[in-house]
Amino acid sequence: MAREKFERIKPHINIGTIGHVDHGKTTLTAAITMALASIGNTKGKNYADIDSAPEEKARGITINTTHVEYETAKRHYAHVDCPGHADYIKNMITGAAQMDGAILVVSGADGPMPQTREHIVLAKQVGVPSMVVFINKEDQVDDPEILELVELEVRDLLTSYKFEGEEVPVITGSALLALEAFIKNPKILKGENPWVDKIYNLMDSVDSYIPTPVREIDKPFLMAIEDVFSISGRGTVATGRIERGKIKMGDSIEIIGGSLRKTTTVTGIEMFQKTLTDGVAGDNVGILMRGIQKKEIDRGMVLTKPKSIDPLTSFEAQVYLLTKEEGGRSKGFTIGYRPQFYVRTTDVTGAILNMLSDDNTPLKIASPGDRITMSVKLIQPIALEKNMRFAIREGGKTVGAGVVSKLIN
C-alpha cells in the first residue's frame, strides 16, 4: 500500500518531556496526544503505546527516547519522551539534542529531585532554548501553599541555570486524571473537565512561549544517525533529525563514522510513516539509501553532503565540570583521565591530554565546579565541528558539559 504524503502546512517543532523518574512524563505525553486527538488533529496514544520498548514495560520506566507526533491549531509537533532513569541519561542526551523546547515535568507531591536538576543542566548544555513547566500530581497535594513552594523552587532552579525562571509559564494539573477522563470519553471537549482543560492550557503555553526556531536550511546537509533499520525488498533506512540543510530523492550523501567514509544515493525519505519529497532541517526522518547493508552503519555515524565535513580525533574545548549536587563527580581528575564523550548520537572514549584554568594557567587537577579548557584525543574519529556541544560521562554520571573551541587536524 502506498504511503500518504506528508503535507508541510504548519511550522514543525521538536519538543520533549524531561524530568525526574516517575514524575509523570510519559503519562503527560499520552494525555497531550489524547487531548489533541479529541479536537481532530492527532491520533491519540495511550501510555503503553509510548512506553514501547519491551524492557521498559517490564520496569515501567522509559528507556529509549520515543517519538510521537501531534498538532495544535498553530503547529505540527514531534514529541520525544525522554527517559528519567539515571542509567539512561545517555538517551536523554540524544533526545534533548533534538529539542526546540521542552516541557519540564515536576511532581507537586515531591518537588524538584536530583534528576530534575540534572535534566535542566543537560537541556542547557545541549542547547534547548526554552521550556514550559508542568507541575503534575496536583490531586495528591492537599495544601495549595505546597504547590506554590514547588513552583518557586522550580523557578529558582531554572534561573540558576540561565533559563528565564521568572517568565517561564507554569501549569499545575494531573496528567493521570486527564488521561483517565479521555479513556472514559475520548470525545471530551474543552470546558467539560477541569483536568483536561489544564492539558489544553499547557499546550497553549507551549504554542505561545516556545519560539519557532530559525532552521539552518542553507547550510550543507547533516544528520546524525539515531537508529538503523532494514526494510525487506527496499534496503537500509537511517533515522534521525536533520540538523541542517535539506535533502531530496536522488541526492548523493556521505556516511561518516569510525573508519567508514562511504558515498551513497538517497532512494526515499519518510517522516512519521508518510513520504516526503524533501527533508529539511528540523525534520525527524527516515532516509532510505542505495546499496548499503544494515551491518555497515550504526547509530552515532552521520549522513552529510559529500566532502562537507571531516572525521577527526583531536580537539580543544571549553568545559564546565558538574558539582556533586548537579550529579557530577565528588572528586577532581588529572591529565590522562579517559571518560566517554557524548557527541550528537554517539559516545566515544577520549583521553584528556592537557588542561588550563579559566585564567589560562596550566592545571594538574580539575575539580567539580571548575570551568576549564581541555585538549582531547578520541580513540576513533567522528564528525567534529567548532561550537559543537557535548557531554562528558563516566560510570553512569554526567561529569562535564562542553563546547568544541578548536579542531586539531
From Swiss-Prot:
Domain tr-type G: 10-214
Recorded GO CC terms: mitochondrion; plastid
Localization per record: Plastid
MF terms (GO), sorted A to Z: GTP binding; GTPase activity; translation elongation factor activity
PROSITE patterns membership: G_TR_1 (PS00301), G_TR_2 (PS51722)
Name this protein carries in UniProt: Elongation factor Tu, plastid
Positions of the UniProt region annotated as G3: 81-84
Residues the record lists as binding Mg(2+): 26
Originating organism: Helicosporidium sp. subsp. Simulium jonesii (Green alga)
Major location (coarse): plastid
Region described as G4: spans on this chain: 136-139
